[in-house]
Amino acid sequence: MAVPKRRMSRANTHTRRSQWKANNAPLQEVRVNGNTTRLPRRLVKAAQLGLVETD
């Protein structure tokens, strides 16, 4: 793991971290009990098993 040679100021740290952005999970259409909903892929199987409530 890279180790910084010098301490980084708080302003520089926050500036660097603020560049990172989270992306929305891609959604897939799922048909459960005749209703079509859009869910993230990791929740598809849980929805089919009835573990996740879909509106």
From Swiss-Prot:
Keywords: Ribonucleoprotein, Ribosomal protein. It comes from the Bacteria. This is Large ribosomal subunit protein bL32. Residues 1-19 have a biased composition (Basic residues). Pfam families: Ribosomal_L32p (PF01783). Belongs to the bacterial ribosomal protein bL32 family. The keyword Membrane does not apply. GO terms for molecular function: structural constituent of ribosome. GO terms for biological process: translation. GO terms for cellular component: large ribosomal subunit. It comes from Corynebacterium kroppenstedtii (strain DSM 44385 / JCM 11950 / CIP 105744 / CCUG 35717). Residues 1-21 are annotated as: Disordered. SUPFAM superfamilies: Zn-binding ribosomal proteins. InterPro entries: Ribosomal_bL32, Ribosomal_zn-bd.
